Amino acid sequence: MNSILERIAKHKLEEVAVAKKNKPLHVLSKQQPGEMRDFITALKSNTSPAVIAEIKKASPSKGLIRKDFNVAEIAKIYTQNGARCLSVLTDIEFFQGHPDYLALAKSKTTLPVLRKDFIIDSYQIYESLVLGADCILLIVALLDDVQLMDFCQLAQELKMSVLVESHTQDELERALRLPTPLIGINNRSLHNFKTDIQLSIQLKQFVPKDKIIITESGINTREDIKLMQSHGINAFLIGESLMRADNIGKALQKLMTD
């Protein structure tokens, strides 16, 4: 692991330890989840770009991304302008997110919602369910193979989908061993935060046809989307370019249509 990811993982362990003290697992697991929505089906339907639109205030590499940050309003705008799913950053320390943002976004949309965070403990999976997540993110670079399989199976037992994220061919091979169709290719290195959207095109050849590739990071223009579609990639996780836009709804529409 690298320094940025190590820092995030170290802090996340401390964060989870505090959460477990405040609300032990036996208490958390008794809370009833709300309505579940089908994340996978939402990405499959029709041929227009399947955009997972992200609610993200800041990042370690870019600092503050959106000053005027109204989670409820952003969720509504994404829903009204053609997003297939939402992604909500819930990491507090590094992304200025919050777990409550996920519950709030879910209450303002009819779309399935992904919890975007750094999962390092099964406690967070139960927490995700209670918050209203329909899908969780597992980052291959953060977990060993036993954790990946255990966490994937637990999430699916709890009726959530799993998006597994890789950045290298080795990580992709590990991701493909998991029983989930959602394969994320992060074009941004978590080692140095450099971005190259060609990575998704390069790694696509190793992904079986029955999987859904979601290209993540660096998708900023209609041309980027057309490039990916020309290589058979039709699902996109897009955050920063939308969050920086003055008119989020228009920006989303511009990405999806000529």
Curated annotation (Swiss-Prot):
Q: Enzyme class, one word?
A: lyase
Pathway in which the depicted protein is active: Amino-acid biosynthesis; L-tryptophan biosynthesis; L-tryptophan from chorismate: step 4/5
Quote the CDD domains the UniProt record gives.
Answer: IGPS (cd00331)
Which NCBIfam families does this chain map to? PRK00278.1-6, PRK00278.2-4
Stored SUPFAM superfamilies: Ribulose-phoshate binding barrel (SSF51366)
Signal peptide residues on this chain, from the entry's feature table:
none
Q: What is its EC number?
A: 4.1.1.48
What reaction is this protein's catalytic activity? 1-(2-carboxyphenylamino)-1-deoxy-D-ribulose 5-phosphate + H(+) = (1S,2R)-1-C-(indol-3-yl)glycerol 3-phosphate + CO2 + H2O
Instruction: State any single GO MF term.
Output: indole-3-glycerol-phosphate synthase activity
Q: Pfam family of this protein, just one? A: IGPS
- Family that this chain belongs to: Belongs to the TrpC family.
List, alphabetically, the PANTHER family matched. Answer: INDOLE-3-GLYCEROL-PHOSPHATE SYNTHASE, TRYPTOPHAN BIOSYNTHESIS PROTEIN
Give GO terms for biological process.
Answer: L-tryptophan biosynthetic process
What keywords is this UniProt entry annotated with? Answer: Amino-acid biosynthesis, Aromatic amino acid biosynthesis, Decarboxylase, Lyase, Tryptophan biosynthesis
Superkingdom of the organism of origin: Bacteria
PROSITE patterns assigned: IGPS
Protein's name according to its UniProt entry = Indole-3-glycerol phosphate synthase
